[in-house]
């Protein structure tokens, strides 16, 4: 089931998404988030997390990073990604 869902998202990314204007306000994009959530949390929880992410991606949301959390949650992950230290 996991592979079927991931293939469906990849099909969307390859065939449908290029025909639409870019609209995702988050990083990673909603479709990439869906794939990562499915791979990390399994098909049922990953699909629920991806759907929740799509529903909160709208013009009135605050854009930014929203990485897939380590623990199942339908809420936004407000944690900023770790920044690499500059060696200079």
UniProtKB/Swiss-Prot annotation:
Native organism: Lactococcus lactis subsp. lactis (strain IL1403) (Streptococcus lactis)
PANTHER family per the UniProt record, alphabetical: MEMBRANE PROTEIN INSERTION EFFICIENCY FACTOR-RELATED (PTHR33383:SF1)
Pfam family, one: YidD
Name under which the protein is recorded: Putative membrane protein insertion efficiency factor
Subcellular location(s) of the protein: Cell membrane
Family: Belongs to the UPF0161 family.
Family matches, as InterPro entries: Membr_insert_effic_factor_YidD
Topology of this chain in the membrane: Peripheral membrane protein
Keyword tags: Cell membrane, Membrane
Tree of life domain: Bacteria
Main location: membrane
One GO cellular component, as annotated: plasma membrane
Entry function: Could be involved in insertion of integral membrane proteins into the membrane.
